[in-house]
Amino acid sequence: MADGPRCKRRKQANPRRNNVTNYNTVVETNSDSDDEDKLHIVEEESVTDAADCEGVPEDDLPTDQTVLPGRSSEREGNAKNCWEDDRKEGQEILGPEAQADEAGCTVKDDECESDAENEQNHDPNVEEFLQQQDTAVIFPEAPEEDQRQGTPEASGHDENGTPDAFSQLLTCPYCDRGYKRFTSLKEHIKYRHEKNEDNFSCSLCSYTFAYRTQLERHMTSHKSGRDQRHVTQSGCNRKFKCTECGKAFKYKHHLKEHLRIHSGEKPYECPNCKKRFSHSGSYSSHISSKKCISLIPVNGRPRTGLKTSQCSSPSLSASPGSPTRPQIRQKIENKPLQEQLSVNQIKTEPVDYEFKPIVVASGINCSTPLQNGVFTGGGPLQATSSPQGMVQAVVLPTVGLVSPISINLSDIQNVLKVAVDGNVIRQVLENNQANLASKEQETINASPIQQGGHSVISAISLPLVDQDGTTKIIINYSLEQPSQLQVVPQNLKKENPVATNSCKSEKLPEDLTVKSEKDKSFEGGVNDSTCLLCDDCPGDINALPELKHYDLKQPTQPPPLPAAEAEKPESSVSSATGDGNLSPSQPPLKNLLSLLKAYYALNAQPSAEELSKIADSVNLPLDVVKKWFEKMQAGQISVQSSEPSSPEPGKVNIPAKNNDQPQSANANEPQDSTVNLQSPLKMTNSPVLPVGSTTNGSRSSTPSPSPLNLSSSRNTQGYLYTAEGAQEEPQVEPLDLSLPKQQGELLERSTITSVYQNSVYSVQEEPLNLSCAKKEPQKDSCVTDSEPVVNVIPPSANPINIAIPTVTAQLPTIVAIADQNSVPCLRALAANKQTILIPQVAYTYSTTVSPAVQEPPLKVIQPNGNQDERQDTSSEGVSNVEDQNDSDSTPPKKKMRKTENGMYACDLCDKIFQKSSSLLRHKYEHTGKRPHECGICKKAFKHKHHLIEHMRLHSGEKPYQCDKCGKRFSHSGSYSQHMNHRYSYCKREAEERDSTEQEEAGPEILSNEHVGARASPSQGDSDERESLTREEDEDSEKEEEEEDKEMEELQEEKECEKPQGDEEEEEEEEEVEEEEVEEAENEGEEAKTEGLMKDDRAESQASSLGQKVGESSEQVSEEKTNEA
């Protein structure tokens, strides 16, 4: 019967227990809590045993007992004091385990039996305590009051209460940590808060530790979780810590690469897929894996079945967001690009081209594939009028049309601005942006079909990457209106030709920025010119049809067009010049001059055989070419243009010689010429694609084996000189590539067809290094020297060309022919097409160099007009090329530009180096070039020492050896890693092995021999075996010395006992025996050395030798004993 009530009483006691706890709290609040905590510590003996119990009454008792002196007056009578004394004695008898059991019984409802068993020992006291506990319930304090003093453990108790609630009773006065048992609290205070000289205390939380390692481990608890993990892993060996996330690294360069994760910098870009990387390791692995190599056209021929991705084509107004592929960076001078592409746009740039509706001028209908398969690769061209911002882009590889895409001319503008580092083109673009925008608005308002009539199929190649890593853009443009395009066999519609006058006046509708004054300037400027090829040429434009330059006796060349006139639409020029009379097989004079000057730049003094080849390539008589070279050598024709540069980028300063040409025309033209310079960039009608800019920008283009490099001098006019002669601008600004009259007829053919189909001209046998040399105008010629010598050093792979028909009439079309054996754009030049190469990556390399380019001294005319000799091949040439690409106005002799403090700065990123060689090696990171190739496995490396270490894999050489474990390494890196991480481990291993060997080693030679024989096969390395044999030899020598001493002692004894004759016999016998022993030892040593190479044979030999030595020693000892 007692069990039931006991259980019920116990049940009811649980909530009261919380109240009791609160009661204690209330009482303690009346006194100083610190004093009470100290009192806990002071009364150790009386409180410890009572506090050890976790039961309800037991845990309450210690607190009441300690607080008793302060509240004895509040209690009624001394009965509780007496009971407490008795209860204390009972608890002492029980011990902590029984008390714990009792506590568990009081908490749980279903353990009444155990409660009853405990009750047998303490029934009276428990009942008395329960009565006292009932009286304590009268205090109404909330349970939360006491929880404030406990630890979070108490927060988990349920309504009925759990043992965790008792931890609130015993709280550490130093750190507020709660304990269920007072002994635990004492130990906690003793080991964590008592300070002495031997302890190590935490400066943050006053914890003390007996060992420093404990303190260090504890200090990690004050750090963030990431720091804790890092410290435990690294063992405090990582000195370089990231300030952003706290991650630490052993090496500084690892930290530098890690910081790029926070900054978002990704300096490494794949030339193939344009993917960017922040770590050089991931970039190198990406390059070596060649995952994106399949996306790259081979030899300029796109692979079939390529996925096509869409290239965004926003309207002209949205030019900043166009995803062109140039590598953009701010130059050291921090010249801001007008419209920089964001990093994200560069990253997400599409690799391939997607089929998109082809927008062609209304007058052109390419509904059927061209004869030569030009359009076979892509769908039929649709003659639809396009919005102003859209320009058709047709990939024109050597074989056929690949995916046509839409390109915004603003993209081209961005490309040119990036490629052209000169201030002039940038200023021109900035100054005329508003004008162009207004013009573009007009064109948008104009009838699309009419605009189509003025547009010409323009070709612009997207950034192209050849097999050799060359990245480029080829712009081949013509100013011819579609109306003048002839019907070519390729099913192109021929538009009705327009009269010359109408072309001049009407050809520039609303969208054209060229003013009517250009006609005047044209008329004024066409008077004086001198032919570069011959001395006497007709001075009249009408004589152009008669100008074929196959006869030296022909009259003087017709006067060149003024720059402004050259910028005018090609139709007017062609109409005026009667270009239509020229046969398609006759290359324009300007193109011929470009070729000749390119040859001259390659070799100023060609041999007769070379001259004949040049004459064949340019379709000119040998004597004409020879005479031209003589004039160039004599200085009559200057490669460099001495014309003054125009102060304003927009204006075209015509030489003073052209007094006929009104300067007002220039004043009126600034916008026009500027537009012309810009026009390719900005969909403006003006035809001028600044080759000069491109050539200037073709700093990016390099004389290295990269494809067409139109490096032109500053004063070089961008527009190529044609027979009709375009006015050359003496300006520093980008070259005006407006097509002169003579090209009009061939321009009538679609640019694509004229380039591909009209490749009537002989294929160039060798790529021309058409470095744009500055041209000095003849006293009568304003234009002749304007043509840039295109620096054409084609790579092994031919460029892919993209034809872009423009809605606006004047956008120069760009098409380049990519024959494997010919210079890609020379055919376009010969076909009256202006060709521009805008290298997107300044650092382009080709694996093969054509014979013409192989001539070591290559004089390249820098955009600033300075000539410099440099090797066409070798890594130095690469660095020169790279610097040339980036030479803004500095002399080219500084191959790599120095900053103000004499450092070498990378032009593709912001890194600066002290040595030019360091910069050159750094450039490999951008280009992906690995110049050091293994001759055995063809693996290439950026650094020579990497190749040296790689060669050791083939040779088996391992020059690095651990002095502890004897392991050898071929690479210094693996050796360093072993020494840093395993050195101590392998040291212990060696010591253990030595100790075991010493234990196994016996005092006799035989045992040593066997030990050596057993150890040798177990050794994985020859060095380990050598160390073992040395130790064995030392042991054997000691034993031999001991044996010799024993033998000497025996001999002395025998000498005392035996006669002299016997002594002599014994001496002879001993000598013989010693010789045998020595021979055996020598044989043993030889066997040991052989055993190092062949373990099995060494073991057998060692055992046999050991037997021999043992037998000989036994014989000697037996004979000596017998004699004794």
From Swiss-Prot:
Residues bearing PTM Phosphothreonine: 702
Intracellular or extracellular location(s): Nucleus
Compositionally skewed regions (Acidic residues) per UniProt: 44-62, 1031-1052, 1062-1084
Outcome of substituting residue 525 to E: Found in a patient with FECD6
Alphabetically ordered keywords of this record: Activator, Corneal dystrophy, Differentiation, Disease variant, DNA-binding, Homeobox, Isopeptide bond, Metal-binding, Neurogenesis, Nucleus, Phosphoprotein, Repeat, Repressor, Transcription, Transcription regulation, Ubl conjugation, Zinc, Zinc-finger
Its job: Acts as a transcriptional repressor. Inhibits interleukin-2 (IL-2) gene expression. Enhances or represses the promoter activity of the ATP1A1 gene depending on the quantity of cDNA and on the cell type. Represses E-cadherin promoter and induces an epithelial-mesenchymal transition (EMT) by recruiting SMARCA4/BRG1. Represses BCL6 transcription in the presence of the corepressor CTBP1. Positively regulates neuronal differentiation. Represses RCOR1 transcription activation during neurogenesis. Represses transcription by binding to the E box (5'-CANNTG-3').
PANTHER family: HISTONE H4 TRANSCRIPTION FACTOR-RELATED, ZINC FINGER E-BOX-BINDING HOMEOBOX 1
Protein name: Zinc finger E-box-binding homeobox 1
